[in-house]
Design a protein with these regions (language model features):
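N-terminal pre-ligand scaffold of iron-sulfur
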Residues: 1-81, 94-95, 107-116
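Short metal-binding segments enriched for Cys and/or His
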Residues: 92-102
């Protein structure tokens, strides 16, 4: 079954230092699928929405390979915590904390995110 994008005027906004940045329309985020967005500094963020509607934003760069691919990873849960698995080497990153579930010494940046 394919989900149709929802129609809404809400935007996904990220907290960058002391300001909010509009990353995309909320309707662009399908539950369980990631979207990459370009940040003002040239970096990338991976945006996710889970099936309950919770939003997550992490750095898109896989720290193990250096490739900007986390937005294309597979999502799931581990012990009730949402994660994305890198599509390259399959390391899993907690979407709320950015910590790698397979090597806790490694993490990706996380961002405060909201729909407004």
């Amino acid at each position: 079954m394919t989900l149709a994008p929802e129609t809404t005027d809400l935007k996904v906004r990220l907290r960058l230092t002391d300001d909010w940045f509009t990353a995309c329309d909320l309707g662009a985020l399908l539950p369980g699928r990631g979207v990459a967005a370009l940040l003002p500094d040239g970096g990338q963020v991976a945006l996710f929405r889970d099936r309950s509607g919770e939003l997550y934003a992490i750095g898109n760069r896989d720290p193990f390979t250096g490739a900007a691919v986390l937005s294309r990873g597979l999502t799931g849960t581990h012990q009730g915590r949402p994660f994305v698995a890198s599509p390259l080497l399959k390391q899993r990153f907690d979407l709320a904390t950015g910590v790698c579930l397979d090597d806790e010494t490694v993490r990706v940046e996380t961002y405060e995110v909201k729909a407004a």
